[in-house]
Amino acid sequence: MNLRSVTSLYDIVGASDMTPNSSGARPHSVLVVDDHEDTRQMSLIVLRAQGFHASAAPSGDAAFLRACEERPDVIVTDLAMPEGNGWELIDKLSSDTRTKDIPVVMLTACATESVRRRAEEARLAAFFFKPCAPDVLAAELRRLSAERAS
């Protein structure tokens, strides 16, 4: 087995992605929703290193409250969580006037055809299976944030 050694954040996200937003504009904001503490913390580290303003919530219920309060540019949510799963969160967000226009990206380990179909029906902004390369996710979040801002 060949394991790659990670000695710094540069090894995870790539040195070219470590530069903060150089335009002087307000950083794009992302709300990360995942019930696993380690996943939330790593997501925050990676997104902040790539110039995003990132916050996190441990459940769909907590994320909905935070989304109403913070109005992030994009929400990245896991699917399987206690206290409000990803589908329940998407339903709440899309039916509330304060949050219905926030793009939602699903990032899940549930790599099944039925999940993919339901994601299409839910009209998610994007859908990724875990593991997902940080630079790919960051590029999509930048695109969605810029699209929403225009």
Residue ranges: model-predicted function:
Residues 1-29, 44, 135-150:
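Non-catalytic signal-transmission and effector/linker regions of two-component phosphorelay proteins
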Residues 78, 108:
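Active-site residues of response regulator receiver
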Residues 51-58, 66:
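Short hydrophobic/Thr-rich beta-strand motif most characteristic of the beta2 strand and flanking loop
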Residues 70-76:
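Active-site beta3 strand of CheY-like receiver
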Residues 81:
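Receiver (REC) domain active-site loop signature in two-component systems and cognate sites
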Residues 41-49:
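Charged docking surfaces used in two-component/phosphorelay signaling
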Residues 130:
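A Lys-centered signature of the CheY-like receiver
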